[in-house]
């Protein structure tokens, strides 16, 4: 838009430069020009001002916004600051903090929202963007690629069969449900009598099956009968191997790692093995009271410690004293 305004401004400037030459024509042409209206209406720019300011002083600002406001000065709908129609309406209603002004602003906002919704309904690009956002397959394209392989797995037929104990339990459950349903429907006692011996038979069969299975297990443990699996079947499965996704680094502040409750710091003790014991006596980083406590904890007297510390230097000093002075020749 700004480039368009600047282009119009350049065209208008070039027209104004050629304006004096056009004025040198016949007086009849000048009278015809004076009779023309001050506004020139066009499809693209309905409010183009013919009396555009000739000098630089007449312009509001040299910015494109100032050029645009000067170019469309005669349009009553366009104004900046307190001269805008919306600002004047708010002042007429009593200011921003009044209820009427708030209602007016809410109505304006609602109108803008409705206009935006209508434009979105007309826009094909907006509809396409919504469809892409709702389509879950669009996210899979952006994600890591997946490779699908067919794998052959050989499984014995016994694994597909349900265990015998589970089959008997299922049969018992079915018969119990049938009996309960018969009692709910208040059937005759003869029907109940017909169903109950069957259940007893099934229960006996189940008990026999349990004993048979226990006997088989005992035989297998003893080694009397060995279990031989039947022929294996091949099952084709589609296995999808997902590629490893890159772990996104979580940006966190160093204060987030701290615990909510303050950590109790261990108190510094002088009586134990601390850094104070590693320093020499002259470079002890504390006052005399702390130094005295350190010596008391070690079980030595401060004067003895000083003597021990200065002992090698005193020996050297005594050795130098005992040497005979060399006489100069």
Curated annotation (Swiss-Prot):
Q: Where is the composition biased (Basic and acidic residues)?
A: 213-229
PANTHER family assigned to the protein according to its UniProt record, in alphabetical order: MCG1612, RIKEN CDNA 4933402N03 GENE
The taxonomy runs:
Eukaryota, Metazoa, Chordata, Craniata, Vertebrata
Query: Could you tell me in which tissues this protein is expressed?
Result: Expressed in testis and epididymis. Expressed at lower levels in ovary.
Q: What happens when the gene is disrupted?
A: No visible phenotype. No effect on testis size, testis-to-body weight ratio, germ cell development or spermiogenesis. No effect on sperm morphology, count or motility. No effect on levels of germ cell apoptosis, chromosome H1t histone association or acrosome biogenesis.
Taxonomic superkingdom = Eukaryota
Give the protein's recorded name: Uncharacterized protein C10orf120 homolog
This molecule's function is given as: Dispensable for normal development and fertility.
Pfam families to which the protein is assigned, alphabetical: DUF5520
According to the UniProt record, where is the region Disordered?
16-41, 183-229
Provide the species name. Mus musculus
């Amino acid at each position: 838009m700004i480039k368009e305004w600047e282009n119009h401004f350049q065209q208008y400037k070039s027209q104004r430069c050629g304006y004096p030459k056009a004025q040198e024509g016949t007086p009849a042409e000048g009278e015809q020009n004076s009779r023309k209206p001050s506004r020139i209406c066009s499809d693209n720019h309905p409010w183009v001002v013919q009396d555009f300011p000739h000098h630089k002083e007449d312009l509001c600002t040299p910015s494109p916004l100032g050029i645009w406001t000067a170019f469309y000065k005669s349009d009553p709908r366009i104004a900046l600051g307190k001269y805008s129609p919306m600002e004047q309406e708010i002042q007429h209603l009593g200011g921003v903090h009044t209820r009427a002004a708030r209602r007016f602003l809410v109505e304006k906002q609602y109108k803008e929202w409705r206009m935006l919704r209508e434009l979105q309904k007309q826009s094909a690009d907006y509809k396409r963007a919504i469809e892409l956002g709702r389509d879950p397959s669009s996210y899979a394209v952006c994600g890591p690629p997946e490779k699908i392989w067919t794998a052959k797995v050989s499984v014995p037929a016994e694994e597909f069969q349900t265990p015998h104990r589970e089959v008997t339990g299922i049969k018992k459950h079915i018969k119990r449900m049938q009996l309960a349903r018969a009692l709910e429907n208040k059937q005759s006692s003869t029907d109940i009598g017909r169903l109950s011996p069957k259940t007893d038979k099934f229960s006996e069969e189940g008990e026999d099956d349990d004993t048979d299975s226990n006997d088989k297990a005992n035989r297998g443990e003893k080694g009397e009968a060995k279990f031989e699996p039947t022929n294996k079947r091949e099952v084709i499965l589609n296995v999808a191997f997902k590629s490893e996704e890159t772990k996104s680094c979580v940006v966190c502040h160093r204060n987030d790692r701290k615990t909510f409750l303050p950590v109790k710091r261990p108190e510094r003790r002088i009586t134990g093995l601390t850094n104070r014991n590693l320093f020499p006596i002259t470079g002890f980083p504390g006052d005399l009271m702390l130094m005295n406590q350190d010596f008391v904890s070690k079980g030595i007297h401060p004067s003895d410690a000083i003597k021990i510390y200065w002992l090698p230097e005193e020996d050297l000093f005594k050795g130098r004293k005992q040497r005979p002075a060399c006489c100069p020749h």
